[in-house]
Amino acid sequence: MLTKKQLQLLEFIHKRLQKDGVPPSFDEMKTALDLRSKSGIHRLITALEERGFIRRLAHRARAIEVIRLPDSLGGGGALGAASDGFQPKVIAGGRGDSADGGAAAELKPVADTGATELTIMGRIAAGVPIEAINQAAAHVAVPNAMLSSSGQHYALEVRGDSMIDAGINDGDVVVIRETDAADNGDIVVALVEGHEATLKRFERKGRMIELHAANPAYPTRSYTEDQVKVQGRLVGLIRTY
């Protein structure tokens, strides 16, 4: 049986994974549970892992997968593929063959695997913005459960460490659903001033847009609405070991 705090934390992690595709940071967990220190979060996570509700992925800061939910959260067993919307997970996988330069993003079903081949359209900065994505580089197989039934999807290789507290490291491949709209808290691909692309957490404040890193070493950057164009929202993460 879980304590009240353990249940609250499990529900918070599960909802964030459903929404963003990545787990919350320890600071976000601490704030959500109204705790004074991160050590309390560490103890709660350890307890949830020991009871078989979550799994921490090795060699990765704050990479957490929810394995099952208790009956009180609508669980009762191991989590499978999502039914209404995606059940985001960190997928350990490999890269496909290189794509032809300049190819457009496309979806290619991978026979008998329950996966779809996405084009990796280039590299995205998780740090200081870099030049905008310009051409396809390779392909990657993405589980169909990670993709929504509507909208176009593409993949990008992450460069930089500004999103490490959101569980996104240098070298990861992020799966993006193409959209020009975002809600506060979404992790998005943002095109800054028409030529620099970056992966950040989105927040609108009046007529200004703030792009937040998930690493205290990087400052929050503020722009006017006409300086930032949302090009997609994070829906999943693929990691090669």
Swiss-Prot record:
Highest taxon listed in the record's lineage: Bacteria
Top-tier EC class: hydrolase
GO molecular function terms listed in the Swiss-Prot or TrEMBL record: DNA binding; serine-type endopeptidase activity
InterPro entries per record: LexA, LexA-like, LexA/Signal_pep-like_sf, LexA_DNA-bd_dom, LexA_repressor, Peptidase_S24_LexA, Peptidase_S24_S26A/B/C, WH-like_DNA-bd_sf
BP terms from Gene Ontology: DNA repair; DNA replication; negative regulation of DNA-templated transcription; proteolysis; SOS response
Site, Cleavage: residue positions: A126, G127
Keyword Hydrolase appears in the UniProt entry: yes
Keywords tagged on the record: Autocatalytic cleavage, DNA damage, DNA repair, DNA replication, DNA-binding, Hydrolase, Repressor, SOS response, Transcription, Transcription regulation
Xref: CDD domains: S24_LexA-like (cd06529)
Active site: S162 (for autocatalytic cleavage activity), K200 (for autocatalytic cleavage activity)
Chain residues forming the annotated DNA-binding region: 26-46
EC number, as in UniProt: 3.4.21.88
NCBIfam families assigned: lexA (TIGR00498)
Summary of subunit composition and partner proteins: Homodimer.
Role this protein plays: Represses a number of genes involved in the response to DNA damage (SOS response), including recA and lexA. In the presence of single-stranded DNA, RecA interacts with LexA causing an autocatalytic cleavage which disrupts the DNA-binding part of LexA, leading to derepression of the SOS regulon and eventually DNA repair.
Similarity remark: Belongs to the peptidase S24 family.
Protein name per Swiss-Prot or TrEMBL: LexA repressor
Species per Swiss-Prot/TrEMBL record: Ruegeria sp. (strain TM1040)
